[in-house]
Amino acid sequence: MSKYIFVTGGVASSLGKGISAASIGRLLKNRGLNVTIQKFDPYINIDPGTMSPYQHGEVFVTEDGAETDLDLGHYERFIDENLSRINNITTGKIYWSVLSKERKGEYLGKTVQVIPHITDEIKSRIYQASKDNDADVVIAEIGGTVGDIESLPFLEAIRQMRSDIGRDSVMYIHVTLVPYLEKSGELKTKPTQHSVKELRSLGIQPDMVICRTHYELSQEIKEKLALFCDIDVNAVIENLDVENIYEVPMALNEQRVDGLIADRLNLNSGSLELERWKQLVDQIKNLSQEITIGLVGKYVSLQDAYISVTEALDHAGFNYDSKVKVKWINSEELEKNGSVETAFQGVDGILVPGGFGDRGIGGKIMAAQYARKNNIPFLGICLGMHCSVIDFAHEVAGLNGAYSSEFHPETPYPVIDLLPEQKEVKDLGGTMRLGAYPCKLIEGTRAYEAYQQDIVQERHRHRYEFNNDYKEQLTNNGLVVSGVSPDDRLVEIVELEDHPWFVATQFHPEFKSRPGAPHPLFNSFVQQALKNSLSSK
């Protein structure tokens, strides 16, 4: 029978509940347990797919094509498991399902209510995650903070589970903030006390409190929190800020968090094996080189919009003993001022990630052009690929006015065009080409050299694609098609033949990168950027 750990948050949002949940998952997995992690988001959207990155940050895409919260990226990277749509549930999905059942008459004339129908639906998704993943332990993070009206049905559902399956199968962990007041020079426990009081008023007694803090908690503070939160002193966990998120599992392990969980849930687990993780963290702390990557996007004021990209760069950097410094370049400002020399001064590589809409598109095209002309290692992702193709078609292949029909429907040369199967699609939500699809690699190319495989599976999120009507003309002028769908219908990767390293992909390689196992394309890109850095010194 599966065990369930519920992670709630209090005092403030953005405390790192997702990192805490992912770190606990890593520790339990290293004890030999099969772990899966869920995120419950209390917003009414079905998923974050149509939300602005400024509102939500990155949309993380799973293998099965779910558009999910960015925390799922953290979960996958920490526990090294592919998750699916059952691992991210929103209020919108829950109500949609319940209302659909009501219309079908599945409630047999009953009045449909939050309790039991909404709460039962929530619980069914938790049990389904356990079943689908054959999990020994399910960790479920409840989004938002305790006290938010939107979270109440989720909190009630997880409260009920203690009665449904027994106290020994359910554990509650509350993540809070212990703020430091500069004026008085002391840490304040009152916000955490009130947050736990609010949680207890809803019928949930936390078994452990993880305290985010800038300063170490004294024994006196821990004892005070234990007294007012009604938990053991050793269950008051200090979660200090760290330089790198991959240090968190070790920090929790030093306080026996995994041991406390194993004891509380009577887990039949093995001894903890954390040596490889410690080696990774030691490696991260002692990187001897540094490179700079210019990341050109229009959401750069909210860096969480590109969190998987920056993590993938870091993973590759670890592999080459290099810290990867990101120089954030606003594509809209670049388009307006045109100062490419200033923008890319000191960069060792240029990366243009995905995005939507025509705002700032000119700046991204300028970035691809600058990398092409100056032999700077370049990685284009999704829209980044489109921009590199547009630049090449216009500047090299002589197709003046070439563009994407997404932005210029009247372009005489739509080198990027809508996928045929998308032409009758009207709804925006969940209707793109989503999830993992196979890609056939062409031997003798940069892509094949990076992967060393004939067929790879990569995750997609797009409606527009390379237009094969211009394939022959572009390849005759030096564009290399290095990856295609198995039926040769879709172009997945393009390169430049007379360039040290210029690769652009239709898919999103960043979603499959892991610490200790960097994605092959990011690995090769960072390697070339490092060579570029060393040769310029």
UniProtKB/Swiss-Prot annotation:
It catalyses: UTP + L-glutamine + ATP + H2O = CTP + L-glutamate + ADP + phosphate + 2 H(+); L-glutamine + H2O = L-glutamate + NH4(+); UTP + NH4(+) + ATP = CTP + ADP + phosphate + 2 H(+). Residues 1-267 are annotated as: Amidoligase domain. InterPro entries: Class_I_gatase-like (IPR029062), CTP_synthase (IPR004468), CTP_synthase_N (IPR017456), GATASE (IPR017926), GATase1_CTP_Synthase (IPR033828), P-loop_NTPase (IPR027417). Its EC number is 6.3.4.2. GO terms for biological process: 'de novo' CTP biosynthetic process; pyrimidine nucleobase biosynthetic process. The keyword Metal-binding applies. Gene3D superfamilies: 3.40.50.880, P-loop containing nucleotide triphosphate hydrolases. This is CTP synthase. The lineage of its organism: Bacteria, Bacillati, Bacillota, Clostridia, Natranaerobiales. The gene is pyrG.
